[in-house]
């Protein structure tokens, strides 16, 4: 019987990253979604590595996702930052982000800070709002952990209770209050994409308790919790979901609307980092 071969990509990535940035241990890993890459421009002593040089990292096919890993210091905190992510709809399945997340764990990260652009299911939460995620509903097909378990990273069965860490979320609320803008909390609904949701699907998501909807987040959050990385996640609302507004949905509109919340988003993240520094 042949021996099962698990992915060694995270181990290879560690060796490659260490050649670019030796003796560097990041505390926080960021995933920056559509139109949100500007934060990485503020990283000091930055070193950038193309995903193409990192085995298992998702070479994105989506406009607005740069496809590079940036390492350095932000507000005095050592960080690693993904400018762009992979999505289920790009054809690599639910594990498209798993090697990257496990690389962060091996690098020494304690926390995954996940961002994304999302649609609002709540009429009072419009474009330009920020929503701190407190839980999720997964409508994608399965999870990244389907298949044989890689015991090097986590147990076969694991809990998603407090997957979106409550203490870190409270810290985000404190920062938002100090910065002077509202930070709503909500439940994220994952959607496979790449088509946008139908109005009927949106009504269903509202009924089952969803507040925001998007095409990412859940695969990386599940991968992170499997290897015991804490998670905090914030969605930038770029549109009202289908059926809740007359605006025609498009990716170009998503990128343009992400600009509405960009400065608040940067202030939120920088304030958060100052508090944990």
UniProtKB/Swiss-Prot annotation:
The keyword Transmembrane does not apply. Gene3D superfamilies: Nucleoside phosphorylase domain. Induction: By xanthosine and to a lesser extent by deoxyinosine. Full expression requires XapR-xanthosine DNA-binding transcriptional activator. The half-life at 45 degrees Celsius between pH 5 and 8 is 5 to 9 minutes. Its EC number is 2.4.2.1. It catalyses: a purine D-ribonucleoside + phosphate = a purine nucleobase + alpha-D-ribose 1-phosphate. It is an enzyme of class 2 (transferase). Pfam families: PNP_UDP_1. Optimum pH is 6.5-7.5 with guanosine as substrate. At pH higher than 7.5, there is a marked reduction in reaction rate and a steep drop at pH higher than 9. Below pH 6.5, there is a dramatic decrease in activity reaching virtually zero at pH 6.0. With xanthosine as substrate, the pH optimum is 5.8-7.2. In the reverse reaction with guanine or xanthine as substrates, the pH optimum is 6.5-8.0. The pH dependence of inosine cleavage does not vary between pH 6 and 8. Maximal activity with inosine as substrate is observed at pH 6.6. One of its GO terms (molecular function) is identical protein binding. Signal peptide: none annotated. Keywords: Glycosyltransferase, Transferase. Disruption phenotype: Does not grow on xanthosine. Slightly increases inosine productivity compared to wild-type (5.6 g/l of inosine versus 4.6 g/l, respectively, from 40 g/l of glucose). Pathway: Purine metabolism; xanthosine degradation; Purine metabolism; purine nucleoside salvage. Phosphate binds at residues 65, 85-87, 117, 216. GO terms for biological process: deoxyguanosine catabolic process; deoxyinosine catabolic process; guanosine catabolic process; inosine catabolic process; NAD biosynthetic process via the salvage pathway; nucleobase-containing small molecule interconversion; nucleobase-containing small molecule metabolic process; protein hexamerization. Rapidly inactivated by p-chloromercuriphenylsulfonic acid (p-CMB). Dithiothreitol incubation restores the activity. GO terms for cellular component: cytoplasm. A purine D-ribonucleoside binds at residues 197, 239. InterPro entries: Nucleoside_phosphorylase_d, Nucleoside_phosphorylase_sf, Purine_phosphorylase, Purine_phosphorylase-2_CS, Xanthosine_phosphorylase. Hexamer. Dimer of trimers. Belongs to the PNP/MTAP phosphorylase family. NCBIfam families: PNPH-PUNA-XAPA, PRK08202.1, XAPA. The purine nucleoside phosphorylases catalyze the phosphorolytic breakdown of the N-glycosidic bond in the beta-(deoxy)ribonucleoside molecules, with the formation of the corresponding free purine bases and pentose-1-phosphate. This protein can degrade all purine nucleosides including xanthosine, inosine and guanosine, but cannot cleave adenosine, deoxyadenosine or hypoxanthine arabinoside. Has a preference for the neutral over the monoanionic form of xanthosine. PANTHER family: METHYLTHIOADENOSINE/PURINE NUCLEOSIDE PHOSPHORYLASE, PURINE NUCLEOSIDE PHOSPHORYLASE-RELATED. This is Purine nucleoside phosphorylase 2. The gene is xapA.
């Amino acid at each position: 019987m042949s021996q099962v071969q698990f992915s060694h990509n995270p181990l290879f990535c560690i060796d490659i990253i260490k050649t670019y940035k030796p003796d560097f241990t990041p505390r926080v890993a960021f995933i920056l979604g559509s139109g949100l890459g500007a934060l990485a421009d503020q990283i000091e002593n930055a070193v950038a590595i193309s995903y193409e040089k990192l085995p298992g990292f998702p070479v994105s096919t989506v406009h607005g996702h740069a496809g590079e890993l940036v390492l350095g210091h932000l507000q005095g905190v050592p960080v690693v930052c993904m400018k762009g992510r992979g999505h289920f709809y790009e054809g690599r399945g639910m594990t498209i982000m798993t090697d990257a997340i496990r690389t962060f764990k091996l690098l020494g990260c304690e926390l995954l800070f996940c961002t994304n652009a999302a649609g609002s299911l709540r009429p009072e939460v419009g474009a330009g709002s920020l929503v701190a995620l407190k839980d999720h509903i997964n409508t994608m097909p399965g999870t990244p952990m389907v298949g044989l378990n890689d015991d090097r990273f986590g147990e076969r069965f694991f809990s998603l209770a407090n997957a979106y860490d409550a203490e870190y979320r409270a810290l985000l609320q404190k920062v938002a209050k100090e910065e002077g803008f509202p930070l709503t909390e909500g439940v994220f609904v994952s959607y496979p994409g790449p088509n946008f949701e139908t109005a009927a699907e949106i009504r269903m998501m509202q009924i089952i308790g969803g507040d925001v909807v998007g095409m990412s987040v859940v695969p990386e959050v599940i991968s992170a919790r499997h290897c015991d990385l804490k998670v905090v996640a914030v969605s930038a609302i770029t549109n009202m979901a289908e059926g809740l507004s007359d605006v025609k949905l498009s990716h170009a509109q998503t990128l343009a609307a992400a600009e509405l919340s960009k400065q608040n988003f940067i202030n939120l993240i920088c304030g958060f980092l100052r508090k944990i520094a």
